């Protein structure tokens, strides 16, 4: 039972790291989209 519990803890820890990594990636994608939007807007008004 304890071994299984330890396995579950490890899996949850890895999942947490994956979620943080995914969140960081999404944040970077959003920044890129914002920059592209600003560029497109600047091109539109010039």
UniProtKB/Swiss-Prot annotation:
Stored Pfam families: DegQ
Any one biological process term the GO annotation gives: positive regulation of single-species biofilm formation
Function: Stimulates the phosphotransfer from phospho-DegS to DegU. Affects protease and levansucrose production.
Family: Belongs to the DegQ family.
Protein name: Degradation enzyme regulation protein DegQ
Organism from which the protein derives: Bacillus subtilis (strain 168)
Phylogenetic lineage: Bacteria, Bacillati, Bacillota, Bacilli, Bacillales
Gene: degQ
